[in-house]
Amino acid sequence: MTMKKLLIIILPVLLSGCSAFNQLVERMQTDTLEYQCDEKPLTVKLNNPRQEVSFVYDNQLLHLKQGISASGARYTDGIYVFWSKGDEATVYKRDRIVLNNCQLQNPQR
C-alpha cells in the first residue's frame, strides 16, 4: 500500500479523534454554578472556552455570550443579561431585573 493511500485511510480517523478529544476537553472546562436567588434557585453552566453561560429561565434554555463589563462578568444574548461579580449575580430581561440577589452556593475557594 502506498503512503498516499494509507494517509487517505488514516487521516479521517485521526481527525475524528481530535474532534472527540476537543469536545471532552471543552466539557471538562465547563463549570456548574448553583445560585440561590430571591425567588428561586438558578443553575448556570459556565463554558470558559466558548466564553458563554447557559441556564434555563422561563422554560427557555438560554445561551449568553460574554460581553463588555467595567466590573464583574457580563453575558448577554441581546435580550437577557447575566451579570456576576464575586459570589453574587443578577439576571435582566430587556434591562429589567428578573432574578435578583443571586448568591453563589458552596463557592470553590
Curated annotation (Swiss-Prot):
Membrane-topology annotation of the record: Lipid-anchor
Lipidation (S-diacylglycerol cysteine): C18
Quaternary state and interactors: Monomer.
Keywords: Cell outer membrane, Disulfide bond, Lipoprotein, Membrane, Palmitate, Signal
GO cellular component: cell outer membrane
Phylogenetic lineage: Bacteria, Pseudomonadati, Pseudomonadota, Gammaproteobacteria, Enterobacterales
Molecular functions per Gene Ontology: lysozyme inhibitor activity
Protein name as catalogued: Membrane-bound lysozyme inhibitor of C-type lysozyme
Site entry: Directly involved in lysozyme active site inhibition: S71, K85
Species, as recorded: Escherichia coli (strain K12)
N-palmitoyl cysteine: lipidated positions: C18
InterPro entries membership: MliC, MliC_sf
Signal peptide coordinates: 1-17
Function: Specifically inhibits C-type lysozymes.
Gene that this polypeptide is encoded by: mliC
Similarity comment: family membership: Belongs to the MliC family. Type 1 subfamily.
Cystine bridges: C37-C102
Subcellular localization, as worded in the UniProt entry: Cell outer membrane
Predominant localisation class: membrane
